[in-house]
Amino acid sequence: MNIMYQRKIESKLQAWLEDPSHKPLVVKGVRQCGKTSSVVDFAKKHFKHIVYLDFREHPDYKKLFTPNLDVDSIIMRLTALMPNTEIKPGKTCFIFDEIQDCPQARSALKYFHLDGRYEVMCTGSLLGVNGYKSKEDKREEEEASIPVGFEEIVDMYPMDFEEWLWANGIKPMHIDYLKKCLTEITPVDDALHSRFKELLHQYVIVGGMPEVVGIFIETRQIGKVLATQRRIIDEYKADMIKYALPADKPRIRECFESIPSQLAREYKKFVYSIVRSTGRGRDYAGSLQWIEDAGIIRRCYNTEITELPLDGNSIQTEFKVYMADIGLLVSMLEEGTQSSILEGNLFSHKGAIFENLVADIFGKMGRKLYYFHKNGGIELDFVMRYKGQCIPVECKANTGNSKSIRTVLGHPEKYRVTNAIKLGDYNVGMKDNLLTLPMYMAFLLSEV
């Protein structure tokens, strides 16, 4: 199945190409998020000739970049290996897929940039992940070097909720209408409200992995969706076994497999003793970092106070861990979860699904994630910068205000907060400085 959906990365690729001083591009992101498809599709639209090298599929391509890295030598070796390849200055784009598997190719980006005759676009997953390389690859990497100042890196994520809406036929006029409802604080039309809720419930099950999205849209069969998601999870686990340092391999997998249990708790702070009863941070911190660097999870940090700057006020040792893609989390839960979600129940598992959905939406916007928790009962699911203020965000099923929101809004002199947002199963409204929004409008809460 090779369906191309509209992706936001396209505008970033276009801006890169139109910049007269652009450098070779590296599109970085978790495996299976659509990097290769987006880059190849873009190149086909803009270049007459494409030279595509996949270093994961064809490790023998590495020899094209030894013993030296000048562009003419690389082209000579390449055309000897692939005689029918057409390479013309000004009309050719080189695509280096899975460039992390060939450090010398990444070093060559400097020489392609200085040469200036050809465009280069790369994709990379597991870039910079500790222990990724074998001993042989490490020797290659030591001989190579990252071309600092000679490459541009763009992050790419799985499809976000807005891209999901596009894939399901939602038009710009419909999204503009939602923006208008947010700006004017007016309820969404009942028919559209029902449609967006339905699409949200489906998104929670499917998530944003392009292959999974394609299978759902083509077949509507949840069984096939689940099988594909679990295959992707298995591929992630295989990467953990294949590429991590030997001592880290079991710990990385244990950390990863503990995520549903971590999120099933009332207070969802990541606790190493849930990974293993004798687990300690010093034993598992590097393993968790590996999963985060691979783009599979996102951390959400507790903050000392509800005040900007959030990063400066964050507590680096206290954090929750969410799956970067909500569909993959749901695929890790017990059978029957998908059916419950389609019926509108997003609040099971002690709010884990709902919270991870918000983390998915905010994270794919490029937001760093923060929350606020103090002993004594004050907990805000998320805090974020919005319209220049620190804004608490509550994710709850009920319509009443929680004790935490009432306390924080009732003591602005202590918490330095005057407005809050509540996301849930209701329409747009405002009361006592609390903006209530349907969950499907969370993607409109950009930092600007």
Predicted regions located by residue number:
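Conserved lysine of the Walker
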Residues: 35
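Hydrophobic positions on the alpha1 helix immediately C-terminal to the Walker A/P-loop
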Residues: 38, 42
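Accessory nucleic acid-recognition modules appended to NTPase machines
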Residues: 214-380, 387
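Interdomain motor-coupling "hinge/lid" segment immediately C-terminal to the ATP-binding subdomain
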Residues: 124, 130-264
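Hydrophobic anchor at the beta1->P-loop junction of P-loop NTPases
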Residues: 27
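Short glycine-rich substrate-engagement loop in P-loop NTPases that contacts/grips substrate
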Residues: 57-90
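N-terminal pre-Walker A segment at the start of P-loop NTPase domains
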Residues: 1-18
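Active-site beta-strand-loop-beta-strand hairpin of nuclease catalytic cores
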Residues: 384-392
